[in-house]
Curated annotation (Swiss-Prot):
Major place of residence: secreted
InterPro entries with a match to the protein in the record: PLipase_B-like
One annotated GO biological process: phospholipid catabolic process
Protein's recorded name: Putative phospholipase B-like 3
Localization terms from the record: Secreted
Short name of one Pfam family: Phospholip_B
Signal peptide location: 1-16
Keywords on record: Glycoprotein, Hydrolase, Lipid degradation, Lipid metabolism, Secreted, Signal
Recorded GO CC terms: extracellular region
Organism (species): Caenorhabditis elegans
A single GO molecular function term of this UniProt record: phospholipase activity
Residues of this chain annotated as glycosylated in UniProt: 50, 82, 132, 169, 215, 309, 543, 546, 560
Function of the protein: Putative phospholipase.
């Protein structure tokens, strides 16, 4: 019990100039895109090997260490939460150090630079999770500790050349670095498989299903059926461009956000995704939304699949040993995969039955502007339930329909059956693949997407009071704010009557937009827009909302921001052509 209380009481070659032009040349002022992240100021930290004790690392607020060779990691952070809704974090590690030390150093830089944001995120999401749920948290603590012990045993049992388990070890090295720096501990590069609040933050998605497995009493204000996200892949007319976008939808307490790039000094042949860029959260190693671009030329997104078949929540399908939680598997898949098929195959290992999603993985290497797509391996999906996992090449669909949309409903028939979605769809079109509001809006409006601006407009779309597909047999108003590509459940009527529980008033809305096209992807860039959709809807304002008792420490009151076009300071090289077999 002491450990339990400790766990949840802690608060992460320019052409040669012609001589006769020398006197006629004047410098031209560089004009930055007003939406570019390049205009922001950054705080820098270097993580350096201690000059007298090589078993310790030091944090230096500078771009360099006194001894250049001692620099393990460089971190850069710009806190723009009050101007854009985002923090921007860049982490680079250096190949002169071992992988373990690099991973730990990357965590140290993040834990130091984003300590305040980690604290706010902890308070908003983790601090109260055991309030009135003491018995549940006992069960959870035992389950998670058993899982951590099993993973540690597998790391020890498998050779260090095993790519999967090596990356598990590196993941926990990075996590340990965040925890140690955040907690202002001695920075000794070690790898801890420990339960602490920073670890709990990684489990945000996995907790949806662990809550059900371990019988946590449901919170009536939580979104009941996992309609967390909208995802979209689109070919421009004539295949002139390609787009991939995502909207995360969740509790509004989750709007403490960070845009990140990790650039590890790993061997690119061993770790093709050694650079990843993503939208995420303070102190969290993976996107969780998810929206991730990798240096191997892949982008992965997901939308959550609710499990209505409660018989799946048993130790037959979900157990602490023999399984690896979703957040770790997604991180490893991003780092190690060269192709979409490799990604979905890698992710399917050690299925934990937690954070059950439809993943969509796009291989940009297979795309050439104005050229016909190959017949295979451009777009892969995977779908998961407890005890079952299936993948499929969806290139044919993208070629035939020029788009693929993901909206929290399984595409694969067996997954639909196992999860219970097929029974739900027979009762309400809300749960029908192809027939739900977002499915019908995507099908109607996808052809309007021709550039990054029209992509942004579609993914932020919500005009529910005028949208025919948002209408419902509801009172007092015959429509729902959940009936848009980006939800506004906070605008529904408290105490209203809705056909389906998830149509109603909830602490649930679109939190963002992320999208990229081919030119942006080539530099691992994307556009990001923080906050719930507005115009024509009202701007979200914590001072003027019907939501009560929703934690939002460190958040701006008014979310009237516009988008940011990311321009990383770090050089980010991406694989642009298919790998040789």
């Amino acid at each position: 019990m002491k450990l339990l209380f400790f766990l949840f009481g802690l608060i992460f070659a320019v052409e040669q100039e012609k001589p006769y032009l020398d006197n006629n040349r004047v410098p031209v002022e560089q004009i930055l895109n007003d939406h570019s992240s390049a205009k922001f100021d950054y705080t820098y930290v270097s993580v350096c090997v201690n000059s007298t004790d090589e078993t310790l690392l030091d944090i230096v607020y500078a771009k360099e260490c006194k001894n250049a060779a001692s620099r393990v990691a460089l971190g850069k952070y710009s806190n723009q939460v009050n101007t854009t809704g985002w923090g921007i974090l860049e982490i680079e590690t250096f190949a002169s150090h071992s992988y373990d030390v690099q991973a730990y150093g990357a965590g140290v830089a993040e834990g130091e630079l984003t300590r305040l944001q980690i604290y706010y995120h902890y308070r908003n999401t983790i601090e109260t999770m055991c309030n009135n749920h003491t018995l549940f948290c006992k069960r959870l603590y035992i389950y998670l500790q058993q899982n951590l012990d099993w993973m540690r045993s597998q790391v020890q049992a498998n050779p260090p050349t095993d790519p999967f388990w090596r990356q598990v070890n590196l993941t926990f090295a990075q996590l340990t670095g965040i925890y140690d720096a955040y907690s202002k501990r001695n920075l000794t590069p070690e790898i801890g498989f420990d339960l602490h609040p920073i670890y709990m933050m990684q489990l945000a998605g996995d907790m949806f299903d662990l809550n059900k497995l371990l019988n946590k009493t449901a919170d009536p204000m939580e979104y009941p059926e996992g309609g967390r996200c909208s995802g979209f892949v689109k070919l421009a007319p004539g295949n002139k461009d390609m787009f991939m976008a995502h909207v995360s939808m969740s509790s509004l307490s989750w709007m403490q956000r960070v845009l990140k790039i990790y650039k590890f000094g790993y061997d690119v042949n061993e770790v093709p995704g050694h650079i990843v860029t993503f939208s995420g959260y303070p102190g969290v190693l993976i996107s969780t939304d998810d929206y991730t671009i990798t240096s191997a030329g892949l982008t992965s997104i997901e939308t959550t699949i609710a499990i209505f078949n409660q018989t799946l929540y048993t130790d037959k399908f979900m157990k602490p040993e023999g399984q690896v939680h979703c957040w770790i598997r997604s991180m490893i898949s991003n780092l190690l995969s060269r192709t979409g098929k490799q990604w979905v195959d890698m992710f399917g290992r050690y299925n934990s039955g937690t954070y059950n999603n439809q993943w969509t993985v796009l291989d940009w290497k297979q795309f050439t502007p104005e050229k016909e797509l190959p017949d295979k391996d451009v777009l892969w999906i995977s779908e998961q339930t407890p005890g079952y996992y299936e993948t499929r090449d969806m290139t044919w669909y993208l070629k035939k329909y020029t788009y693929f949309a993901s909206y929290n409903i399984p595409f694969l028939p067996k997954v639909s059956e196992i999860s219970g979605f097929d029974n739900k769809a027979r009762q309400f079109a809300w749960f029908d693949w192809g027939g739900s509001p977002r499915a019908r809006i995507f099908d109607r409006d996808h052809s309007k997407v021709t550039d990054i601006d029209s992509l942004t407009k579609l993914m932020r779309y919500n005009d529910y009071t005028h949208e025919e597909f948002a209408r419902c047999k509801c009172t007092p108003n015959p429509y729902t704010g959940e009936g848009g590509i980006s939800a506004r459940g906070d605008l529904n009527t408290p105490g209203g009557t809705y056909e389906v529980e998830s149509m109603g008033f909830r602490d649930h809305a679109g939190l963002d937009f992320k999208g990229t096209n081919y030119e942006m992807f080539k530099k691992m860039r994307f556009r990001a827009w923080g906050g719930p959709p507005y115009d024509p809807l009202p701007v979200f304002d914590w001072n003027h909302t019907n939501l009560t008792n929703v934690r939002h420490f460190g958040q701006p009151d008014v979310w009237n921001f516009t988008y940011v076009d990311l321009e990383w300071q770090l050089a980010a090289q991406v694989q642009l052509t298919p790998y040789d077999n």
